[in-house]
């Protein structure tokens, strides 16, 4: 092999390795919640406190009387703790509702909750879902998984 061919092979090898590292980094972003991942949960808690707590409560308690419509006809922000119905939804539904807002998913449903697609990355949304799920007791987590599996 000539020196020029060796050099070209080395360059191609470096490019391939670099591309592989880049793909590995891209895959490191969460594509599902992981309520047992302390780092992801901490990230989710920080994002929740900044973006969600003003409506859903700093303790995930939701707004008072959340089961009854507001004067504008819309529903108050529900709790995300075990007393609410968040755990009745699949992980994908929780992600989608956060990303595009409930109104975009349910035809005719009006909600004060906006979608966060322009404010949060997908990884941030999964981190928030991870944080919320991390606060649920094991029996609620298990019920959510059983209820929402296809």
Where are these regions (language model features)?
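Bacterial N-terminal signal peptides
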Residues: 10-20
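Bacterial N-terminal signal peptides that target proteins for export
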Residues: 2-12
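The canonical Cys-X-X-Cys-His
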Residues: 44, 48-58, 113, 128-132
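Electrostatic cytochrome c docking/interface patches
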Residues: 23-47, 142-150
